[in-house]
Design a protein with these regions (language model features):
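Active-site lining segments that contact anionic ligands and/or coordinate catalytic metals
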Residues: 195
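Conserved metal-phosphate-binding beta-hairpin within the catalytic cores
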Residues: 198
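Extracytoplasmic cell-surface/polysaccharide-interacting catalytic and binding patches
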Residues: 1-58, 62-84, 88-192, 203-217
Length: 217
């Protein structure tokens, strides 16, 4: 999996909470062995098309999901949060299935990811000092993710982020279908409300809560 790109968003401040989540001591993608082997096969297939996977989230400590619950109980809202969620209260995000109190990620069997065009040049970088448009805006206006335009940003709580959304362009639909097809060929199942979320049936089990730490050399 060494060639797979990573941008583990909950290990930093570029996420809907605006800070690192509990348990993310390092920006590392941790997965179960069978998940990793499947990802390796997908990456090899995509490389022949000059594409790469980019991971946004992998294993998520259970304490991080609890951190999200505590965040939702705080009624205050920031401009950064509004980039991800224009329409719903924080509490509604759980009821509508955009955030889970108990996440598949904590079993090591779920992933959030996207596609990167390896031939693309001069990809914009996220600037924490800049005011970006919300996650449904055109790609030139919303926060950059260094990846192919999938129609919304990652973690966007909006119907436009639903994998089969009708409001996206043909090109955006093509790339979503490319990602789903590549993942499906190795047994992954997409979550219909989030184009970026996939899980591997049979790889789940008990939830874990060990913190994510930097790899030792």
């Amino acid at each position: 999996m060494n060639s797979i790109l990573q941008d583990i968003r909950y290990a930093g401040a570029n996420n809907f909470i605006g800070r690192p989540l509990a348990g993310y001591g390092a920006a590392e993608c941790v997965v179960k062995r069978e998940v990793g082997l499947a990802l390796k096969a997908i990456q090899q297939e995509l490389a022949r098309q000059k594409l790469s996977l980019k991971m946004f989230d992998c294993y998520r400590p259970a304490r991080a999901s609890h951190d999200m619950v505590l965040w939702a109980q705080n009624g205050r809202e920031t401009a950064a949060e509004r980039r991800y969620n224009r329409a719903f209260s924080k509490q509604e995000l759980f009821r509508l299935g955009y955030i889970a109190e108990h996440s598949q990620h904590s079993t090591g069997a779920a992933l959030d990811l996207t596609l990167v065009d390896l031939a693309a040049d001069n990809l914009a970088r996220f600037d924490p000092a800049r005011a970006y448009a919300d996650c449904t805006a055109p790609v030139q206006a919303r926060a950059p993710e260094g990846s192919i335009d999938m129609g919304t940003g990652y973690d966007c709580s909006d119907a436009k982020a639903h994998t089969a959304a009708s409001s996206i362009t043909p090109a955006q639909r093509k790339w979503r279908n490319t990602l789903v097809a590549a993942m499906s060929r190795q047994g992954f199942v997409n979550y219909s409300k989030e184009w970026w979320h996939f899980s591997l049936p049979g790889a789940g089990g008990a939830a874990y809560d060990f913190p994510i730490m930097a790899r030792r050399n």
